[in-house]
Amino acid sequence: MAGHSKFKNIQHRKGAQDKKKSKVFTKLIREIVTAVKTGASNVPENNPRLRKALNAARSQNLPKERIDKAINSANDASNNESYMEIRYEGYAPNGIAIIVEALTDNKNRTASEVRSSFTKYGGILGETGSVNYLFNHCGVIQYPINIASNEDIFEAAIQAGGNDIISDYITHTIYTDIENFYKALGFLTDKYGIPEDSYIGWIPVNTIIIDDKEKAKKLLKLIAVLEENDDVQRVFGNYMLSEDVYEIIQEE
């Protein structure tokens, strides 16, 4: 009986992992299609957004045939598939500002689903521009801490045109102006390889510390539900979990 239960748990975890991977692949494919359709070239070297999208896809092990299919689909003049880039803004419980970036082929559907998620978990969806003043809009490039020393990565970031770099015990994070993002990303990719993550995003000017476990779980549930939406590419918030709350949640 115990063996059967363990098997079921393994199957459940595998199913959840497969579902999560499928959603990641869907988001990657949408970004590839959008990069091709909005770029001036199908050649990654001449289309920085496409180069970034392809690097991200390969780092997530998106099969080559699916990458090629996405590019061919985007190049097909008879294919009307296209995605709109839309930003949603609102508040989670306890005054946490949330920005949601989406790529969608149906903005009414996405708006309804995002609004429903906010409402279900105690938040409120506002108008575009209602919270973005609480964030800096900039480029972010992240490498594992062991890729280079703090001094070397700092020097490389300056050469790449970065504005700031923060190194903790896990990650080097380089910040850039939006207009310099792809140039900096190309420079650092040539020097250190594909980064762990890179994006143009929203970094909070100030953060609200969440030091209550139940409040943290409710907030993280809202963010998880938003991120599970196929149309949602990224979710940003101006919060940070306290060390104690983070450790408690990690253990559960």
Swiss-Prot record:
Task: Output the SUPFAM superfamilies linked to this UniProt entry.
Answer: YebC-like
Q: Name one GO cellular component term.
A: cytoplasm
GO BP terms, alphabetized:
regulation of DNA-templated transcription
Name the residues that span the membrane.
Answer: none
Task: Report the leader peptide range.
Answer: none
Chief localisation class = cytoplasm
Q: Where in the cell?
A: Cytoplasm
**Gene3D superfamilies, from UniProt?**
1.10.10.200, 3.30.70.980
Tell me which UniProt keywords the record has, alphabetically. Answer: Cytoplasm, DNA-binding, Transcription, Transcription regulation
Alphabetized NCBIfam families for the sequence: PRK00110.1, PRK12378.1, YebC/PmpR family DNA-binding transcriptional regulator
Q: Which family does it belong to?
A: Belongs to the TACO1 family.
The molecule here is called Probable transcriptional regulatory protein RP455
For this protein's source organism, the top of the classification is: Bacteria, Pseudomonadati, Pseudomonadota, Alphaproteobacteria, Rickettsiales
